[in-house]
Regions:
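Cleavable N-terminal signal peptides of Sec/SRP-targeted secreted and luminal proteins
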Residues: 4-16
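Beta-propeller domains
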Residues: 19-201
Length: 201
């Protein structure tokens, strides 16, 4: 990307941001219910270990209970919708002496890029409303055009988990699956985004 493209992009961001601020003064204020009460995002990745001597857990030792859901890392408070959050896996591992809990963000291409810029970059479902929605679409289209956002890897991997052929995947309808790895110490990591040369999502 050359300097002229960067100048054009930054100028557009400045002008569109000013317009959006003005337009929000006369537009409807949208709900924030998906960021409150039981929907409050988890802000940190944690590992918690609880020792136990309960023999009831022997029946399920070396098993894992896991779920995945929407948990935004960078969020627009006003326009956020729970479809938009980054995928986060919550897992509990059992053995005969301890229970281990761990939560991890799925390291999607989308999240990695936003972590690099330390801000929200992608277009959110909840933003597609009114004048502000049109401006966000225009801004997002220019970011794609100038190469700030790649044409692939836009999914959040926040919809479901699939265990298939001894492999664990995080799924999202709008993107390829992300393969996860759980090692012998119950450390959850994102292994890779599946890629097939003749298949696009």
């Amino acid at each position: 990307m050359n300097y002229m493209q960067i100048i054009i992009f930054l100028t557009y961001i400045l002008l569109s941001s000013s317009f959006v601020v003005l337009s929000k003064k006369v537009c409807k204020k949208y709900t924030q219910k998906y960021l409150t009460n039981k929907f409050v995002p988890v802000l940190e990745e944690k590992t918690l270990i609880v020792q136990h001597n309960n023999k009831k857990f022997n029946k399920i030792q070396h098993n894992i209970f896991a779920q995945i859901g929407s948990n935004p890392k960078f969020v627009n408070n006003e326009d956020y919708h729970w479809f938009d959050g980054d995928g986060m896996i919550h897992g509990i591992y059992f053995n005969n002496s301890k229970i281990i809990y761990q939560n991890k963000w799925i390291q999607t291409k989308r999240l990695q890029l936003e972590e690099k810029w330390k801000r929200k970059l992608y277009l959110y479902f909840g933003e597609l409303k009114g004048i502000n929605g049109l401006m966000q679409i225009m801004k997002y289209s220019l970011m794609e055009l100038f190469g700030f956002i790649p044409p692939y890897g836009k999914g959040t991997a926040n919809t479901a988990l699939l265990y298939w052929n001894k492999r664990l995947f995080a799924l999202h309808e709008g993107d390829m699956p992300y393969e996860l790895n759980i090692d012998e110490y119950f450390n959850i990591t994102t292994k890779q985004r599946l890629h097939y040369p003749s298949l696009y999502s």
